[in-house]
Amino acid sequence: MSLRLRPTMLSDLDWVVSLERDGANRPFITPWERTQHEGAIRFPDSRHFTLEEGDALTRIGFVILQGCRNPNGSVELKRLVLQSKGRGLGRAAVRQLKAMAFTQLKAHRFWLDVKALNTRAFELYRSEGFVEEGRLRESVRVTTDGADGYDSLIVMSLLDREYQARVAMGQEAA
């Protein structure tokens, strides 16, 4: 599977916003306004990427990294949204993003938060070496099937030394 990250263009944003608002993605993220995405494209501390697959470079998702110039070396995987689930694309994207965070951005810590109800993503991140740091209990409001409630955010991270150990053990591409 050929997966490519390319900088998101302003011309991609209608598609990005529609992907965020899709019913399959909405329960797991807090959608942004278009202007927030524009800011992430323009702000030097952020990286906004469109994920493309195959020779045809078909758009399949997008990614937002924040803290790319953080003086503490703490880069956040702010958002990873895919159009299609269950094909290994999320894992492939996470692996590319880890390599980018630790090799290109020289991160000390690569972190994210994931909604507790998003068990599939939690298990993916855990299997890719991310460690649970804690939970922000009932910190996000969710509406599911018309019912209003709260979900917790799970904060996870991977440190550079943990990533390098995974590379040494052959769990990451060198």
Regions found by a protein language model. Name each.
Residues 53-60, 142-151:
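Intrinsically disordered, low-complexity coil segments
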Residues 72-74, 122, 133-140, 153:
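A short, glycine- and basic residue-enriched loop/turn
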